[in-house]
Amino acid sequence: MKVLVVVALLVTLISYSSSEGIDDPEADELLSLMANEQTRKECIPKHHECTSNKHGCCRGNFFKYKCQCTTVVTQDGEQTERCFCGTPPHHKAAELVVGFGKKIFG
């Protein structure tokens, strides 16, 4: 039984090592970098409107920005919702503490 398991493991390793996925690891890395760059271009920057895409805010220094919404009343009395990407208060406090700690401890 042990011999069968070892032989199966060896066959799996040999077939895996001969596959094309391992031949070019630099291409896989390049593709992942390109995908990350594309994601960065598509995200919504801080203080920009995110009403139509509430989960598309970019990442800040430490945290991802959150889509914060408010209700706006026009002169006609119509209520509409407007949203923007921003830093929530508890994230601002955490960034302040981390920044203060960096100044003190180097």
UniProtKB/Swiss-Prot annotation:
InterPro entries, per the entry: Spider_toxin_CSTX_knottin (IPR019553), Spider_toxin_CSTX_Knottin_CS (IPR011142)
Signal peptide: 1-19
Tissue expr: Expressed by the venom gland.
Keywords: Disulfide bond, Knottin, Secreted, Signal, Toxin
Cellular compartment(s): Secreted
Cystine bridges: 43-58, 50-67, 57-85, 69-83
GO CC terms: extracellular region
Keyword Cytoplasm: no
Record-level Gene Ontology MF annotations: toxin activity
Propeptide stretch(es), residue numbers: 20-40
Keyword presence, NAD: no
Principal location class: secreted
Family: Belongs to the neurotoxin 19 (CSTX) family. 04 (U1-Lctx) subfamily.
Record remark: domains: The presence of a 'disulfide through disulfide knot' structurally defines this protein as a knottin.
Protein name (record): U1-lycotoxin-Ls1b
Organism listed in the record: Lycosa singoriensis (Wolf spider)
